[in-house]
A protein has these predicted regions:
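Compositionally biased terminal segments of proteins
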Residues: 1-147
Length: 147
């Protein structure tokens, strides 16, 4: 259970409209999705408490691949939205960073494993390096705002 992280996701969401066509009829629905600040902070807590490879993958994927400007935008959003609250995540941030300390760390391997399933043509060494850099940059950026 991830009770520490859910508060970040619950307090930072946006409404997105998704459409589909079914039997020739257009349908649209609005869905609450976690925002750029809430998602990585919730995933940081989830990675620490659940230790599931999917959480590590999601974290490393969402940082550079979000629609708002990559890891730098995620850091800025988290710092702006949750200033003064990230000190509570310091242990989880330390743990996240340790799980991406190099290309052979558990988080890096989890990211590469899933990305190779989804995109077998991608170079595993480059994937691991991308994950290490993104997570390091995020941890350093949000940690600096907590001090």
């Amino acid at each position: 259970m991830n009770l520490r992280g859910t508060r970040f996701a619950a307090r930072d969401f946006e409404i997105r409209t998704f459409g589909l066509r079914n039997s020739g009829a257009e349908h649209a629905t609005e869905v609450n999705v976690s925002g750029l600040a809430g998602f990585p902070l919730a995933k940081t807590a989830a990675s620490f408490s659940r230790r599931k490879p999917r959480d590590w993958h999601d974290m490393a994927f969402a940082l550079p691949h979000n629609d708002s400007g990559g890891t730098t935008a995620a850091i800025a959003s988290a710092r702006e939205r949750f200033i003064g609250e990230m000190a509570a995540l310091q242990t989880a941030l330390d743990d996240l960073q340790a799980n991406f300390q190099d290309s052979d760390a558990r988080g890096s391997r989890a990211y590469v494993t899933q990305m190779r399933i989804d995109h077998p043509e991608l170079n595993p060494e480059m994937l691991a390096a991308d994950a290490v850099i993104a997570v390091e940059e995020f941890c350093r950026g949000v940690r600096n705002s907590a001090n």
